[in-house]
Amino acid sequence: MLEITGTVAKREMKSQLLDDMELERERGITIKLTPVRMQYKGYTLNLIDTPGHVDFSYEVSRSLQAVEGAILVVDATQGIQAQTLANVYLALEQDLHIIPVINKIDLPASDVPRVTAEIVNLLGCDESEIIKVSAKTGENVDYGLDAIIERVPAPTKTASDETCALIFDSYFDDYRGVIIYVRMFSGKLPKNANIRMMATGSNDIALEVGVLNPKMSPRDELQDGEIGYIVTNLKATREAKVGDTVTLVKAPAHAALPGYKNVRPFVYAGFFPVSNDQYKDLKEALEKLSLSDSALQYEPENSPVLGFGLRIGFLGLLHMDIIRERLEREFGLDLIVTNPSTDYHVVLTTGEEIDIRSASDLPDITRVAEIREPWAKGEIITPKEYIGSILELIVSKRGVQKNISYIDTRAVIDFDAPMANLLTDFYDQLKSATSGYASFNYELGGYHAEDLVRIDFLVAGERIDALSVMAHRSEADAIGREVTKKLKQVIPRQNFEVALQAAIGARIISRETLGAYRKDVTVKIHTGDRDRKAKLVEKQKRGKARMKRFGKVDIPSEAFTVMLKRD
């Protein structure tokens, strides 16, 4: 589209042009959304390239509120995926005009008739409305541009003169501060105007305003209906949150645009530097990343075993993986990341309710009246022949099947399951059970009171708080046995015997023993000197007993990720 409209010269074109981050290019995904303005046949088109992954669905929903139509791109080799459904529902909620496009028709593995039938089934559209393109060769892409002009309405002009602009993204520039992307819904926003963020109450100056072509192009003002950027003097994106409304200080709008909500993380993990000297560097690195990622939340955490670190909240596992990789690559940090967990609502015997984000934070069980765990609403799209194995997998995760519907040759399975059971290896097991053909999407459903316990893991009698995990009582024994076996594989043998135990309170539910190295202390003694041999063996026994009492076991970083690789 950028090439056909002349927005970017052919010599400057490259794949994933709008994906600026190195990680985006490497993984072939969009992590941050990107707006761009194009001119075509006398019309101005504002395109927003959005991430498709469930972790970033709030950003997608905000950007959908900034536009009048959406191009739904479906891979001709893959067909409709679970996240396709999620994003279609978001677009339909906003009453957007959807233009269905099948891409990659040039590939030998493409199955255009099947994917066409799936889209017709999903949207209820006519087959003639679906545009079949190859983004690689450019075939039929101009039909997509024509369809935007024909089917997507122009922004409606409002009678109000109040300045109202929706923030649909923001990022931190090292040299210029916070830059926000906005859609103007009414009024005008001139350069150097005093502006206010209505949800946070922050006041600032619009140092520069303009549009993106896709590079920044300064203008004197932004007008009703336009999509553009504002360079502010703010020092953190949390002061200009996605979904907030920008207005003028001198003539503020009477009401903010609808739909703003605080993004709440539901996956938490402890990040600890391998060297304690790097704790300050970790904190500074996260401060920098959070300037451009308002969804990132963190607080200090102190572990007796791992030392000082941070407990960080994420929107999902992909979000966590991206942040971990950026910390290691961009800031050169060597990290130990503990098992991801979710937050639990704990009702105390006094009636007080508290939230815990780590199993080690659970109060003494005598003070706990009830523990509520988050449940997810999940959706799986799969070829029909895998329905049986998927239902078995859902039941094994304490899930409940709610509904099965069909899109042409594939089934859509709706189910509820505990969020914690989807955070470990559910996705890998799903891919394995369906030979990689199923796709999976989920969202937070609510909190249910369950019979939960905390499993602690002890190494040589010492509780390793970073390994503690919440589990349903019915699953606790199996988890304890499995994890102690895994720990035996990853913790190196010592000069003394080491007990690896799983416990619920004071009750040991599983034990593995890591055998000691055997050093032959009699090797240099003459074979006939039995008394001397016996003395040396006895001395070795006493030494090992002393080491067992006072010896410290070094636990490798792999031990803290064993929960992610459960069978």
Question: Over which residues does each language-model region extend?
Answer:
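Structural and coupling elements of P-loop NTPases
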Residues: M1-D567
